[in-house]
Every structure is written in C-alpha cells, then in structure tokens.
Design a protein with these regions (language model features):
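A residue-level structural signature of the nucleotidyltransferase/glycosyltransferase Rossmann-like core
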Residues: 49, 71, 100-101, 166, ...
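Cyclic-nucleotide recognition modules
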Residues: 72-130, 134
C-alpha cells in the first residue's frame, strides 16, 4: 500500500507509452522503499500501478507449506502491479533500496476507452505477460544447470551490462525464483565458474563477469554437464 513508502516530489517516467498513459491522466507520486520493505501485499486492493526508477522488486507468494515462490523480478524501467482483478495476486518487496513512480490505476485504466490509451495499456500488459512466459519457459528447463544458465542469460539481456553484471538478488531469491535449493544454485554457479563461463567479484558474489556469453547461452538450451554431488 502507498502509506508504507515515503513520498517526495511528483515526477514522470520517460518512456513513450508510459508518458502517453500518464500525461494529464494519472495522479503521480515518487516513492522510495528501503530494501526488504513491502510495497503491497497479496490480496490487498490493486489500487496502484508502479514503475521502477531505480532498484529492483520481487513479487512472490507464500505457499501453504511455508515456502516462498518468487513469480518475477522487476528491474529499472519495469512496470508492475497491473492486475486483471481488483486485488494483488502477489506480495511485492524491494530487493534493494528502490525508487518508484506510482499512479492510481483507475486514472490510467479509466481512460482505456480512448484508442491511443488502449494501445498503450496493451503494451504494458504485453510486457508483463512476456516476463511471465519467460519464467514458465525457464521453469520448464530439464536440469538445474540449464535453469541457472537461462536465468543469468535473461538477467544479462534485461540489465544490458557490457562488463560486470551486478545482480540485486541473492542466491535465496534465485533459488525461490527457479524452484531450486540454495545449495543447488550455488553448485550450478560454481560449475559455470569452473568451466570458465563466468567469474565472481565482490564479497557476496553478486558481481558476475560473463566471460563467454555464447557458452552460457548454449548451456541454457541444453547442458550435458552434471552438477557435483552435495
């Protein structure tokens, strides 16, 4: 909910369809969330749509057995909180200190009867669906190594870092996103490192140097390598 954040000045993001949607239509606020702060909770009224200025957000569900299933990672420029119903289906949390723009959903979608606005709304929805489809394809990989390699390839493409890829999420986040254990994710990353495909920098190994993107992409498609035993 909005009252969990601290408001600052009103601003507007600088992407084409977002500008078109929000020009003289939405009531805008610029909010900041500290890492680990809940932005909205599952089953809360879906009153707002969010776009990330900087930082990263995870959306997840807590399963009946207590496990956490992360449905998506949202990075700078991404829009989230678009629902086809009146409540949020996931909980959203800031992974790191994050700044977002927030618009009232009814102010945006209330104008969807206009042709141009409808097109812009559909573009935003299509992006959300694309992320969801990519996640389903990723979960359908046969091996854990393929899943981790595909995840790194996706993050590399989304973050567009030519040198060092600095992941905002930790290994527990990655494991909960891929449906794996932390130990399995760690073994997969270690194997990719041993194969010379990547190397690590930084204390927490979140800074990744991709030494061979082509090999990583091949690994994401089909891998004959086996993880070392735990």
């Amino acid at each position: 909910m909005v009252d969990r954040a601290s408001a600052s000045t009103n601003n507007q993001p600088q992407t084409s369809e977002w500008d078109a949607l929000t020009s003289e239509k939405a009531f805008w606020r610029d909010f900041k969330y500290l890492h680990g702060t809940e932005i909205f909770g599952e089953a809360e009224p879906a009153d707002y749509v969010y776009r990330i200025r900087s930082g990263a957000v995870r959306t997840f569900k807590l399963l009946p057995d207590g496990r956490r299933q992360i449905g998506a990672f949202h990075l700078s420029g991404d829009v989230f909180g678009i629902e086809n119903g009146d409540i949020y289906r996931f909980t959203a949390e800031a992974i790191v200190n994050t700044s977002v723009w927030i618009a009232k959903r009814r102010r945006i979608f209330g104008d969807a009867s206009e042709e141009n606005t409808t097109k812009d709304v559909l573009k935003l929805i299509a992006r959300s669906l694309n992320h969801a489809e990519n996640h389903l394809l990723l979960l359908g990989r046969q091996t854990s190594l393929e899943k981790v390699a595909a995840f790194l390839t996706e993050m590399d493409q989304r973050m567009g870092s030519p040198g060092v890829m600095i992941l905002p999420m930790n290994r527990r986040d990655i494991a909960d996103y891929l449906g794996l254990t932390i130990e399995t994710v760690s073994r997969a990353l270690s194997l990719l490192c041993c194969e010379g495909i990547l190397s690590f920098r930084g204390q927490h190994h979140r800074e990744i140097v991709l030494r061979s993107r082509s090999k990583l992409a091949q690994m994401a498609i089909l891998s004959d390598l086996k993880l070392p035993p735990s």
